[in-house]
């Protein structure tokens, strides 16, 4: 496992949850003796929606909503067997989407 790399991508709508989860992952990886790069903040995706408030007239009256998607990237450069076991047992928040890629 010494020449492999683990890339972890996190997505969330809440920036506090994603920062807390990324901190847990980094602490777990460092505790098991792996070298960690990150968390790297990726660009925030902002989706905006405009909705008419009136069903008939008053085109100028609109409500505006937005959804922000926060992303973080963590690279574990030299993972050990303990690192992989600890990451599998790690319990993260429900609002965070985790994608793990071995490379």
Curated annotation (Swiss-Prot):
* GO CC aspect terms: ribonucleoprotein complex; ribosome
Matching entries from InterPro entries are given as: Ribosomal_uS10, Ribosomal_uS10_CS, Ribosomal_uS10_dom, Ribosomal_uS10_dom_sf
> What superkingdom does the record give?
Bacteria
Q: Name one GO biological process term.
A: translation
Gene3D superfamilies cross-referenced by the UniProt entry: Ribosomal protein S10 domain
Q: Kindly list the GO molecular function terms attached to this UniProt entry.
A: structural constituent of ribosome; tRNA binding
UniProt keyword annotations, A-Z? Ribonucleoprotein, Ribosomal protein
**HAMAP family in alphabetical order:** Ribosomal_uS10 (MF_00508)
Family listed: Belongs to the universal ribosomal protein uS10 family.
Give the record's subunit note: Part of the 30S ribosomal subunit.
Role summary = Involved in the binding of tRNA to the ribosomes.
Query: In its UniProt entry, what is this protein called?
Result: Small ribosomal subunit protein uS10
> Which organism is this protein's natural source?
Acinetobacter baylyi (strain ATCC 33305 / BD413 / ADP1)
The gene it comes from is: rpsJ
């Amino acid at each position: 496992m010494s020449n492999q790399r683990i890339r972890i991508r996190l997505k969330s709508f809440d920036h506090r949850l994603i920062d807390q989860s990324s901190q847990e992952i980094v602490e777990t990886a460092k505790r098991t003796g792996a070298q960690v790069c990150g968390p790297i903040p990726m660009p925030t995706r902002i989706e905006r929606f405009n909705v008419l408030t009136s069903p008939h007239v008053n085109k100028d009256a609109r409500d505006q909503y937005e959804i922000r998607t926060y992303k973080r990237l963590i690279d574990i450069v030299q993972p050990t067997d303990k690192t992989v076991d600890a990451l599998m047992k790690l319990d993260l928040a429900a609002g965070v989407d985790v994608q793990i890629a071995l490379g």
